């Protein structure tokens, strides 16, 4: 998720 960087880092984009 590019919009949610915090979630992206945890999920791995």
Swiss-Prot record:
| BP term (GO), one | neuropeptide signaling pathway
Organism encoding this protein: Periplaneta americana
Residues that span the membrane, as ranges? none
Phenylalanine amide carried by residues: 13
Q: Where in the cell is it found?
A: Secreted
Keyword Secreted appears in the UniProt entry: yes
The entry's keywords: Amidation, Neuropeptide, Secreted
Single GO cellular component term = extracellular region
Q: In which tissues is it expressed?
A: Expressed in the brain, frontal ganglion and terminal ganglion (at protein level). Not detected in antennal heart (at protein level).
The organism's place on the tree of life at top rank: Eukaryota
Instruction: State the name under which the record lists this protein.
Output: Allatotropin-related peptide
